[in-house]
């Protein structure tokens, strides 16, 4: 009986600390210091939620830059089913999927002269990538420019404005947030 009382008190104390105090404290600090991130990094335009800066979207229209393929179950870019395909590099199913993606990208981007960037035909581990490297974005510029009836230079300028360079040159590559880039192109059309 002498051991039971301290055990119950410790259980109650740890439940209050780890189940109540700690979550409340981290939520409060997150809301205070990182308000945008704690609320999903949402992109709000004209009072309307257009998406998140951190989750890709399934852009299929020729006017939009397309992100990496999504391997999420059910529907592309489903945030409730985040995860990769888990197909081995030697799996014929993966080989066929990549072949189909290359053929579809070549058909949709006949102006592209270089090989299709690997990033555009392979899904990421999360299946929800929101950004692409400059190489993959540049490969799509002729298609997007033609579909929007803009010059490649006009589109390239918007791409450069939305390209994030790495903090240190030898760590990482320049990337563009595809959701923000496509929204910027839409906004340019309205102006």
From Swiss-Prot:
Signal peptide: none annotated. InterPro entries: KdpC. GO terms for molecular function: ATP binding; P-type potassium transmembrane transporter activity. GO terms for cellular component: plasma membrane. Its main location: membrane. It is found in: Cell inner membrane. The chain crosses the membrane at residues 6-26. Keywords: ATP-binding, Cell inner membrane, Cell membrane, Ion transport, Membrane, Nucleotide-binding, Potassium, Potassium transport, Transmembrane, Transmembrane helix, Transport. It is a single-pass membrane protein. The system is composed of three essential subunits: KdpA, KdpB and KdpC. Part of the high-affinity ATP-driven potassium transport (or Kdp) system, which catalyzes the hydrolysis of ATP coupled with the electrogenic transport of potassium into the cytoplasm. This subunit acts as a catalytic chaperone that increases the ATP-binding affinity of the ATP-hydrolyzing subunit KdpB by the formation of a transient KdpB/KdpC/ATP ternary complex. NCBIfam families: kdpC (TIGR00681), PRK00315.1 (NF001454). Belongs to the KdpC family. This is Potassium-transporting ATPase KdpC subunit.
């Amino acid at each position: 009986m002498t051991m039971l009382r301290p055990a119950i008190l410790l259980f109650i104390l740890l439940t209050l600390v780890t189940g109540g105090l700690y979550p409340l404290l981290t939520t409060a600090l997150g809301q205070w210091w990182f308000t945008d991130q704690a609320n999903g990094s949402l992109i709000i335009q004209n009072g309307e939620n257009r998406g998140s800066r951190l989750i890709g979207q399934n852009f299929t229209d020729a006017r939009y830059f397309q992100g990496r393929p999504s391997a999420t179950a059910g529907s592309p870019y489903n945030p409730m089913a985040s995860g990769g395909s888990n197909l081995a590099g030697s799996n014929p199913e993966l080989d066929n999927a990549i072949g189909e993606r290359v053929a579809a990208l070549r058909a949709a981007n006949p102006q592209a002269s270089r090989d299709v960037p690997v990033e555009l035909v392979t899904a990421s581990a999360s299946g929800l990538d929101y950004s692409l490297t400059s190489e993959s974005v540049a490969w799509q510029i002729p298609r997007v420019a033609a579909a929007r009836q803009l010059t490649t230079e006009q589109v390239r300028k918007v791409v450069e404005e939305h390209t994030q360079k790495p903090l240190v040159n030898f760590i990482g590559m320049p990337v563009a947030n595809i959701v923000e880039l496509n929204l910027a192109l839409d906004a340019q059309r309205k102006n």
